């Protein structure tokens, strides 16, 4: 935490470093070992509209704890009532990019606390926050990784964060 409070829009206009949370929802499959739940961002989002993204993500509000922010974002975006102990912390990811959306520059510099959530999730039971999420879908982990790498699917997923998740899944799959 920097001790400096900025509104989200200001942080992205100035490119200020800020804290976020990233939650990856995964389940076992027979193909490569895992599926990841992807969200398709709303067409009205201020950045990367209509692109596929990780399961859930958001800013850490001033005064909030990181883990409570992760739990809040899962509830707000997907309607998932996760318990803090169900979120597996896997590390911090630094992400940065600049792009123009709707004729305005968007500058993102974030330190993301990354979590994996492995509790059962049924798409038909999710309550999507329409302002944020247009749709969700399961995709095989390796297929998704390849599409992100090749750029054959519109997305805003960091490849190096994808690798972080893969390393975590490799470690925990030994006990499967």
Regions found by a protein language model. Give the residues of each.
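Nudix hydrolase/Nudix homology domain
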Residues: 50-52, 56, 91-102, 106-176
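Local beta-strand/beta-hairpin segments that build beta-sheet-rich folds
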Residues: 1-3, 90-93
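Acidic, metal-coordinating catalytic segment for phosphate/diphosphate chemistry
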Residues: 1-31
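A glycine-rich, hydrophobic loop/mini-helix early in the fold
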Residues: 20-59
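Residue-level structural signal for beta-strand termini and adjacent loop
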Residues: 7-8, 42, 66
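The catalytic Nudix box helix
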Residues: 38, 55-90
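Short, well-ordered strand-loop elements centered on a beta-strand within folded domains, enriched
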Residues: 1-5, 31-40, 124-128
